[in-house]
Amino acid sequence: MRYDKLTAKFQQALAEAQSLALAADGSYLEAGFVLKALLDDQNSGAAALLAHAGVNVPQVKQRLQQHLNSLPKVSGQGGDILPSRELQAVLNLMDKAATKRSDAYIASELFLLALVQQNDATGKILKEAGATEQNINAAIDAVRGGQNVNDANAEDQRDALKKYTLDLTQRARDGKLDPVIGRDDEIRRAIQVLQRRTKNNPVLIGEPGVGKTAIVEGLAQRIVNGEVPESLRNKRLLVLDLAALIAGAKYRGEFEERLKGVLNDLAKDDGNTLIFIDEIHTLVGAGKTDGAMDAGNMLKPALARGELHCIGATTLDEYRQYIEKDAALERRFQKVLVGEPSVEDTIAILRGLQERYEIHHGIDITDPAIVAAAELSDRYITDRFLPDKAIDLIDEAASRVKMEKETKPEAMDKIDRRLIQLRMEKAHVEKEKDDASKKRLELIDEEINGLQKEYADLDEIWKAEKAISDGAANIKKQIDEVKIKIEQAKRQGDLALASKLMYEDLEHLEKQRAAAERADTDSTKPANKLLRNNVGAEEIAEVVSRMTGIPVSKMMEGERDKLLKMEEVLHRRVVGQDEAVRAVSDAIRRSRSGLADPNKPYGSFLFLGPTGVGKTELCKALAGFLFDSEDHLIRIDMSEYMEKHAVARLIGAPPGYVGYEEGGYLTEQVRRKPYSVILLDEVEKAHPDVFNILLQVLDDGRLTDGQGRTVDFKNTVIVMTSNIGSQHIQQMGIQDYEAVKEVVMEDVKEHFRPEMINRIDEVVVFHGLDQDNIRNIAKIQLKGLEKRLEKQNLRLAVSDAALDIIAKAGFDPIYGARPLKRAIQSEIENPLAKALLAGNYAPESEIRVEADGDRLKFA
């Protein structure tokens, strides 16, 4: 027996058999242990070969286990166990069979043949299960495909297509693929390339999420349905699993052997198999080690000769980075460009997928939800592509509704929490013996009984609604299964079965579904329903809001009233400046009502005016109004961008420079918070080149950062503030607004280029503040102090006379409202801080600030 000529797979089986014999306290290594090791190994192919030969494999396994259990046991056996005489005889027969077949190595399938030839106990088990020398020989010939075993790893290369590929056409027959809607031109172009004599390899190139893999699935469905030219009919479409090819390839050359096995199997198939390689750029460099070939180079000859019918898919960037660099590989593929579908096409795609998602989640998806998913994803999710991003919205909204359906409704949850609270209170009150506690106990018992009854009623309604909903979902699932069976029966030509399924089973299920839907509608009025069972446009809008931070939910009456009273709300923080507040309010109302140009920012303004008149404060008030938080204000001090090279800090350093990976300050902030107020403060202090990057933002609402990513500014309000022309505003005072603006604009035109001014929606001039304005600002600022004192359980009351003194002390026509803050600090906060530290005011007391001549006094 030539032990050195055993294949790696059979050597592994012998080692495993040795372990089994030791574990069973066997006296010898019997042939039965080797057979068990082969049958237990999923990758050995022994079980498949026996099944191919018509042997009852489960019977073999059962009888074999009984035989091994009956063998004599030797306790305390140490070291290796020697092969029994029967096993040595079987191994010798294997050697003879290998020589007869001209094999260089002895493969594990010859062990099965030798067992049948040898008339020992294990051989009898095989014969009783239906094994004969003739049918085992025939099965070996079928498995080998006419090839000899010429190297130790020959068994690993068998059935390479089964191990390293997935059959898409079989999945299409089983109804496991989603329907592919549209994309006819791309599928037709791919078929056209596949029918060429040479270089018949299409590569689908497009952005991530546009549906490249779906096109291949569509082709698989067409092949199964016979909707392809004659030359492609009955072909198999397999997906190459490159990860499985590479995984576990420990030794040099092992990966190449596996790939060669796949190529050999494809060559044997004589062009009846198409192979799809997703992310085809991963072939370039796959399996590459020092001096070894990579997968891309191994595929080139087969691709050029037309032996390998390959369909590739990759993104534009990766095609350029990997495939285009290798000109020899590139010329073997024919490009099929896959563009992003339009919103209308996406709606059609979603309607095609609607039923699959309804069955998966067990809920209904309405048509308005489908339209909203396509339109809102196109408008607000700008860094991804249709239809993928629209499908994601539908999937996530459906998942959310399903989660709500499977958990306790909010109304019941509130009652549950209240009951827990009351029971805890009852436990404490029961310990008390006074009359008040007894009365309280009666009230608690009464409330608990009422809530328990209400909870029981709601629980009954919820369970009934859930049962109806689950029943309808189950019927939908059965309908889908019947439809798949109808398609399979039609393909097999079994028209009798197809008509039975269609006119009996399907009609019966459709009636059941209609009845279930009627029961769902009649069970409770929509207002009283505890369960939400469908996805509408509002659910989609909620998901978009959560994903992007953009409030796109349908405008409620409260928000409409809020927008109509926007000036009033902003004037609570910004005193005077009626023209500025009106201009900003009009821009926001235009955008929120859907009348503004969707491809531009919500509004772009240039605020001009002297220091301290409320330019920056209006931006803060606007951010607070729109988002209930000033965190959505992106403030950039333009005095930091006085040098020409500082532009790179806004959009990110170009490739090759330090900080390239970090991105730009402005672009990164807007990517994270796409719905923001952008304040470019003191804009006239920036270098003129900074304005060049703003032109694109103001006109198209987008900006390309240093890494080539397009950042969307369409949901931002851009405000630039400047002190240009402030001397004219101070000299002319509060005269005719248009006259002041005309004079100031002359200075603006000298500083900014015409193309910059032309792109700004509105230039707003802020006028100086008068004594009354300062008095009103003092009231606003003192409210902030009142809130801080409230935290210390103190109240603040400022008399009108005291307010006049503060306003007078804080009034300066040149510096605006900023001196007022200093006046409040010196006149009120400083003396008050000393008094508080001295302990002059007890908690809950009121601090009154009154006038005492020209000074203030505290009481």
UniProtKB/Swiss-Prot annotation:
Where is the segment annotated Linker?
A: 341-549
- The UniProt annotation puts the region (NBD2) at 559-768
Its function? Part of a stress-induced multi-chaperone system, it is involved in the recovery of the cell from heat-induced damage, in cooperation with DnaK, DnaJ and GrpE. Acts before DnaK, in the processing of protein aggregates. Protein binding stimulates the ATPase activity; ATP hydrolysis unfolds the denatured protein aggregates, which probably helps expose new hydrophobic binding sites on the surface of ClpB-bound aggregates, contributing to the solubilization and refolding of denatured protein aggregates by DnaK.
**Record domain Clp R: where:** 3-146
Coiled coil ranges (UniProt) are: 391-525
- Top-rank taxon, per record: Bacteria
What positions does the entry give for ATP 1 binding? 206-213
Please give a single GO biological process term from the UniProt record: protein refolding
Repeat 2: annotated segments: 83-146
Q: Which family does it belong to?
A: Belongs to the ClpA/ClpB family.
Give the UniProt keywords, A-Z: ATP-binding, Chaperone, Coiled coil, Cytoplasm, Nucleotide-binding, Repeat, Stress response
Q: Summarize subunit and interaction data from the UniProt record for this chain.
A: Homohexamer. The oligomerization is ATP-dependent.
| Location within or outside the cell | Cytoplasm
SMART domains according to UniProt: AAA, ClpB_D2-small
Q: Which Pfam families match?
A: AAA, AAA_2, AAA_lid_9, Clp_N, ClpB_D2-small
The gene behind this protein is clpB
Region ranges (NBD1)? 159-340
Q: Does the keyword Cell cycle apply?
A: no
Q: Which CDD domains match?
A: AAA, RecA-like_ClpB_Hsp104-like
Naming one, the record's GO cellular component terms include:
cytoplasm
- The identity of this protein, by name, is Chaperone protein ClpB
